[in-house]
Swiss-Prot record:
Lineage: Bacteria, Pseudomonadati, Pseudomonadota, Betaproteobacteria, Burkholderiales
Organism: Cupriavidus metallidurans (strain ATCC 43123 / DSM 2839 / NBRC 102507 / CH34)
Location of the protein in the cell: Periplasm
Pfam family of the protein (one): Rotamase
Chain residue ranges for the region called Disordered: 46-76
Biased composition (Low complexity): 48-58
Keywords: Chaperone, Isomerase, Periplasm, Repeat, Rotamase, Signal
Free-text comment about domains: The PPIase activity resides only in the second parvulin domain. The N-terminal region and the C-terminal tail are necessary and sufficient for the chaperone activity of SurA. The PPIase activity is dispensable for SurA to function as a chaperone. The N-terminal region and the C-terminal tail are also required for porin recognition.
Listed EC numbers: 5.2.1.8
InterPro entries with a match to the protein in the record: OMP_Chaperone_SurA (IPR050280), PPIase_dom_sf (IPR046357), PPIase_PpiC (IPR000297), PPIase_PpiC_CS (IPR023058), PPIase_SurA (IPR023034), SurA_N (IPR015391), Trigger_fact/SurA_dom_sf (IPR027304)
GO molecular function, one term: unfolded protein binding
Catalytic activity reported: [protein]-peptidylproline (omega=180) = [protein]-peptidylproline (omega=0)
Entry keyword Isomerase: yes
Protein name: Chaperone SurA
Length: 493
């Protein structure tokens, strides 16, 4: 199973997706990630299938930080008078930050020959994204999460690899864009901090049970694809947030406010406009819409209230949650496209490698230099297996570096991506992962039957990923709802 970065992207239109991802590329997986697939436990660089409890723990690689190569700014703003456009808890977002980010997104849209949205819409989306980033970064910092310089170095190396350049070339591009190298590293460090927080607060709490795997396989492998997919609900909300330390009198006052909004909706007022003007939820600028979701991906308090409603109906009473009071509407619902039956064959790669581990006594640059020398010797006649036995620091060294036949999704992304670019017999350039520096050789490729055990492994990974996406959405929403955010400009202008 490929490892997808779960996010809110599935709810956004194409230009909003580019707003969040732009020229983003995947970085090195956190050190806790395994070389092998979800649901396995490590034995050196090799792994074996673990028990259910192992697969429910922290062995699944979390979604990874994203960072792109900054583009040169056509209009430096060093002489602009800056001002605060939003306050997020105890920090601020400035107009310069907002305009710089919006310009970058607009530049990427134009470069991709994509339609550029109206400037007010773009600025509103960018500002909300900056708020969401700031809220998550603050939560990570308050949790005391630290990211080492070595982790940042590893992430930078991966960015460079993904953009087919060296770390030195990446630095030149960054500085040419007008961003200092220190700033770039700081931004990357913040992203890794957020990933660490999510590992602790979201990833580690998601479990997958055998019954869920059975249901998934029954739906996917029932002989034929289902005639139709699951029902999806497009729910919108207006949130009246209640502070954690609110008194009973304050709660009563805020509930009265929510009930007043409900009466306006029941009286024919436009729900989306009321949400834009009154909701304190992150999706307020989209009229309160959460986008289409299966019932299991909705907050439980919403799911129970809307499951039997007709499209266009409003829940007849104000709902209460830990975040406050909600006015909820079922905007529409639809039947999702059917999932195709799972293939009973997969492509596998026979691969071997040489590993030099990096650490305090082996800097990454030196490991790459040594690996380049080893590669040169192999290309001039030294046997790969002999070189692996002599130089590799992996448990596979005694077997000539053999990892055997591997399936898609079984290896960390940097390794698998480099492997997939090779033809049988070819040898990679040095490849950096969290384990160190690798030299990879593809020996052969084949298609093979998927065993029942492997199907369950894949199903477990897919079910877990679906649950992670839902849990992540809810986690981000709770962080945003609990934050103090004051807009100093109208997000709709």
């Amino acid at each position: 199973m490929k490892r997808q970065a779960f996010s809110l992207l599935s709810r956004l239109n194409p230009w909003q997706q580019l707003l969040l991802s732009a020229v983003l590329v995947t970085l090195a997986a956190p050190a806790a990630a395994q070389l092998r697939a979800p649901g396995t436990r490590t034995q050196g660089i090799f792994t074996q299938q673990g028990s259910q409890s192992a697969s429910q723990g922290s062995t699944v690689a979390p979604s990874q930080p994203m960072m792109g190569v900054p583009q040169p700014s056509s209009q430096p703003r060093s002489q602009l008078v800056d001002e605060v456009v939003a306050v997020v808890n105890n920090s601020v977002i400035t107009r310069r930050e907002l305009l710089d980010r919006a310009d970058e997104i607009e530049s990427q849209l134009r470069a991709a020959k994509r339609e550029v949205p109206p400037r007010p819409d773009l600025l509103g989306e960018v500002l909300e994204r900056l708020v969401m980033e700031r809220v998550q970064t603050q939560a990570a910092q308050e949790a005391g999460i630290k990211v080492t310089d070595q982790e940042v170095d590893r992430a930078i190396e991966s960015v460079a690899q993904q953009n087919k350049m060296s770390a030195t070339e990446l630095r030149s591009r960054v500085e040419a864009s007008g961003m200092s190298w220190t700033k770039y590293r700081d931004e990357l460090r913040k992203q890794v901090q957020v990933i660490r927080l999510r590992e602790r607060e979201v990833d580690s709490k998601v479990q997958v049970y055998d019954g869920e795997i059975d249901n998934y396989l029954a739906a996917r492998n029932g002989g034929q694809a289902a005639a139709s997919g699951p029902t999806e609900f497009n729910v919108a909300q207006i949130l009246v947030r209640v502070p954690e330390d609110a008194s009973d009198a304050q709660k009563a006052q805020l509930k009265t406010k929510a009930e007043g909004l409900l009466k306006q909706v029941q009286g024919g007022a436009d729900f989306a406009e009321l949400a834009k003007a009154n909701s304190e939820a992150p999706e307020a600028s989209q009229g309160g819409s959460l986008g289409f979701r299966e019932i299991g991906r909705l907050p439980a308090v919403f799911a129970n209230a809307v499951v039997d409603l007709q499209p266009g109906a409003v829940v007849p009473e104000v709902l209460e949650s830990a975040n406050g009071f909600h006015v909820v509407k079922l905007v529409s619902k639809r039947t999702a496209a059917a999932q195709p039956a799972a293939s009973d064959r997969i492509a596998q790669t026979q691969v071997r490698h040489i590993l030099i581990r990096t650490g305090p006594n082996m800097p990454e640059a030196e490991a790459k230099r040594q690996m380049a020398t080893i590669r040169d010797r192999i290309t001039h006649g030294v046997d790969f297996a002999d070189a692996a036995r002599r130089y590799s620091q992996d448990g596979s060294a005694s077997q000539g570096g053999e990892l055997g036949w591997v399936s898609p999704g079984e290896l960390v992304p940097e390794f698998e991506q480099a492997m997939n670019r090779l033809r049988p017999g070819e040898i990679s350039d040095p490849v950096v992962t969290q384990f160190g520096v690798h030299l990879i050789q593809v020996e052969n490729r084949r298609e093979t039957e998927v065993s029942p055990e492997k199907q369950r492994d894949f199903a477990r990974a897919e079910v877990r990923e679906q649950k992670l996406r839902a849990a992540y959405d809810d986690w981000v929403r709770q962080l945003r709802s609990a934050a103090y955010v004051e807009y100093r400009i109208n997000r709709q202008r």
